[in-house]
């Protein structure tokens, strides 16, 4: 499993905080950030890498998280969530089988961002009754 991470200019600093944290937790990180990327381009790059392997997860950071979320939800087979708290990050894995989260550097601080990332990457899909909704989401794109 790889954690694919990316950010636009507004999310660069927080991306490095999250990246360093996850590397210290022994996760394999793939950073697809390129200088001057818009949130649209970085979200597409993260999604492309996430979709290469079933187990891969993605994190995109910009100023507010809304833009990358909108982009991610346009991608076939991508279930994504915009999160700004630990519980939502964990639960979106458990109930929605989300493979990508977005967050805003203007909304969350360093410690919260690390906790959000930790909740997301440690969350496990519960399946069962939740699969009905996941199937519905996947049919939409």
UniProtKB/Swiss-Prot annotation:
Pathway membership, UniProt: Carbohydrate metabolism; D-galactose 6-phosphate degradation; D-tagatose 6-phosphate from D-galactose 6-phosphate: step 1/1
Record-linked InterPro entries: LacA, RpiB_LacA_LacB, RpiB_LacA_LacB_sf
Keyword vocabulary terms for this entry: Isomerase, Lactose metabolism
GO biological process terms held by the UniProt record: D-allose catabolic process; galactose catabolic process; lactose catabolic process via tagatose-6-phosphate; pentose-phosphate shunt, non-oxidative branch
A GO term, aspect molecular function: galactose-6-phosphate isomerase activity
Reaction(s) catalysed by this chain's protein: aldehydo-D-galactose 6-phosphate = keto-D-tagatose 6-phosphate
EC category name: isomerase
EC number: 5.3.1.26
Domain of life of the source: Bacteria
Cysteines joined through disulfide linkages: none
Pfam families found in the cross-reference section: LacAB_rpiB (PF02502)
PANTHER family: GALACTOSE-6-PHOSPHATE ISOMERASE SUBUNIT LACA (PTHR30345:SF5), RIBOSE-5-PHOSPHATE ISOMERASE B (PTHR30345)
Xref: HAMAP family: LacA
Family the UniProt entry places it in: Belongs to the LacAB/RpiB family.
Quaternary assembly: Heteromultimeric protein consisting of LacA and LacB.
Name of this protein: Galactose-6-phosphate isomerase subunit LacA
Species annotation: Streptococcus pneumoniae (strain P1031)
């Amino acid at each position: 499993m790889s954690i694919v991470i990316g950010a636009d200019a507004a999310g660069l600093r927080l991306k490095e905080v999250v990246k360093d944290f996850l590397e210290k937790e022994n996760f394999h990180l793939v950073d697809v950030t390129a200088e001057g990327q818009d949130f649209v381009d970085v979200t597409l790059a993260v999604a492309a890498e996430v979709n290469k392997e079933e187990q891969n997860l993605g994190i995109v950071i910009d100023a507010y998280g809304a833009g990358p979320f909108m982009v991610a939800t346009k991608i076939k087979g991508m279930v994504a969530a915009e999160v700004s708290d630990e519980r939502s990050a964990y639960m979106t894995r458990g109930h929605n089988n989300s493979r990508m989260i977005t967050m805003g550097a203007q909304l969350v601080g360093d410690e919260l961002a690390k906790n959000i990332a930790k909740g997301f990457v440690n969350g496990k899909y519960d399946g069962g009754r939740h699969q009905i909704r996941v199937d519905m989401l996947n049919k939409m794109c």
